[in-house]
């Protein structure tokens, strides 16, 4: 699914306008525990989270996420924006909570990219 469509479905605000959003996202993963993100996510997906610190972007980069959506209208810390620009990872803010947003995206056809296997 194209990130532009995801932003529309999320009623999202793009926080990194200088980063290209004409990219394909293959699935979604929602979590606030970054150790779970590293252990159970799959590459080329969108991370849905309530955390807004710079570590979220660093974790997303390590796990090969293509974009990050902050839930409940949260805004990232200024340093988070800087790291996202350096790593070329689009940041989006959505007014929906994690459960609602995940459901909307899944209903629209975005598959879950949560692995059921632990290391």
Where are these predicted regions, by residue range?
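Compositionally biased, intrinsically disordered low-complexity regions
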Residues: 14, 29-32
């Amino acid at each position: 699914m194209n990130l532009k469509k995801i932003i529309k479905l999320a009623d999202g605000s793009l926080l990194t306008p200088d980063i290209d959003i004409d990219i394909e996202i293959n699935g979604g993963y929602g979590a606030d525990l970054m150790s779970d993100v590293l252990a159970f996510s799959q590459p080329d997906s969108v991370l849905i989270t309530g955390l807004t610190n710079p570590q979220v972007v660093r974790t997303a980069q390590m796990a090969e996420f293509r974009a990050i959506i902050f839930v409940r209208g949260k805004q990232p810390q200024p340093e988070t924006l800087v790291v996202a620009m350096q790593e070329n990872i689009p940041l989006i803010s959505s007014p929906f909570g994690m459960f609602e947003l995940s459901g909307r995206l899944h209903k629209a056809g975005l598959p879950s990219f949560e692995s059921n296997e632990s290391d």
